[in-house]
Amino acid sequence: MSEKSKGIIIFASNTDKIDYLEIAARCASLVRHTLKLPVTLITDDEQYQNSVFDNIVRIAALDNTNTKYYNNTTWAWRNKSRYLAYELSPYDTTILLDADYLALTDNLLKLLDTHFDYLIVKDSYNTQEVLTQPMARGSINFLWATVVVFNKTQITKNLFELVARIENRYSYYCAMFNIFNQSYRNDYAFAIADLIINGYHLDNNKRIPWSMFTFDSDIKNMERLNESLIIRTDKNAHIIPVQDIHIMDKLYLLSDSYKNFLEEYINAA
């Protein structure tokens, strides 16, 4: 039996304010270093080229109507069509990553040789609190679709088909699950699809077995000091062990400061 192919998929579509393709390229340069896996970009940009990606798959143009609120500002957010990951992935085992996820370790590799249909992040925390919460009052907790690891099985195929159905009928599912903010979120769609797939039972066997660290404040700079990371904001400095991080500050991910951090991090090994 031939060895299963393994790789990473990143979706990225630019908006008028954020160059998500550049964020994805920086993410790819990091994961090629830490995970040493091929990386496929899925984008609706018809002309974008970058050799950091092993493969670029182009999809139909995404609408620009979805929004998110961060740092007292409403941003356009083109996060739809994630359900295409199953169909378009060229790999037997896929790590589906958001471009703002910094894989600073090789921890995700530990999941690839285990037996599973799919695994999703259940819990996330920041420097002060656990971020896991219900989608709405009286509803289920959402999952973090920031990282989804999956094998090509019938159950996984069913999951992504359900995500597609939920995206296309999002208002209906929002009403069903008591969600009042109807701005589309993959975190919600995957949580609902996961619940339905598992017979309306929560199956913790389909969870990534550790919590995700999310930094949800604006960042001034980051620095690695031996086995620690120093994350500086305008007011504070946070010292944490080296670990994977979900970064919410997209402007920092586009900054020269972050570019320099990546170059130093990659070249230090």
Regions found by a protein language model. Give the residues of each.
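A glycosyltransferase accessory/donor-loop signature
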Residues: 1-11, 21, 41, 51-52, ...
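Short, acidic, metal-binding catalytic loop of nucleotide-sugar glycosyltransferases
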Residues: 26, 30-37
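Short, hydrophobic beta-strand segments that form beta-sheet elements in well-ordered domains
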Residues: 36-44, 95, 119-121
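Short, polar loop motifs at secondary-structure junctions
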Residues: 42-48, 61-62, 103-105, 124-125, ...
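Short loop/helix-cap segments at secondary-structure boundaries that form the rim of catalytic
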Residues: 46-54, 109-114
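Active-site-proximal specificity loops/subdomain of glycosyltransferases
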Residues: 48-89
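GT-A fold catalytic core of metal-dependent nucleotide-sugar glycosyltransferases
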Residues: 58, 78-128
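Class I SAM-dependent methyltransferase SAM-binding "motif I" and its flanking Rossmann-like core
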Residues: 120-142
